[in-house]
């Protein structure tokens, strides 16, 4: 079973709201999922992610889609081996 981290659409017409979920790659976009990793509000541009869950699923071999990878890059720093490292805080 190949696991993907992808966006699951919610909201109403012209007001999308997404959940970042870990799901089987063979399941439809809005189908069953294994775990909710975070949320993404496109209107207000608010991204909320559970850091522990993100690292857990990436260490299990989950492959983020291109859009989720961009969201993760906004909040984290990718290393070469696709592991996530928290950014350093300013001193």
UniProtKB/Swiss-Prot annotation:
GO terms for molecular function: structural constituent of ribosome. Pfam families: Ribosomal_S16. The keyword Disulfide bond does not apply. Belongs to the bacterial ribosomal protein bS16 family. One of its GO terms (biological process) is translation. Keywords: Ribonucleoprotein, Ribosomal protein. GO terms for cellular component: cytoplasm; small ribosomal subunit. It comes from the Bacteria. This is Small ribosomal subunit protein bS16. The keyword rRNA processing does not apply. It comes from Phytoplasma australiense.
């Amino acid at each position: 079973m190949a696991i993907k981290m992808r966006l699951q659409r919610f909201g109403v017409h012209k007001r999308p709201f997404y959940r970042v979920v870990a799901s089987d790659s063979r399941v439809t976009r809005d189908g069953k999922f294994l775990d909710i990793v975070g949320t993404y509000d496109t209107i207000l541009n608010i991204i909320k992610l559970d850091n522990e869950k993100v690292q857990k699923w990436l260490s299990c071999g989950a492959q983020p889609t291109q859009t989720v990878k961009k969201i993760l890059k906004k909040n984290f720093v990718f290393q070469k081996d696709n592991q996530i490292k928290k950014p350093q805080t300013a001193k």
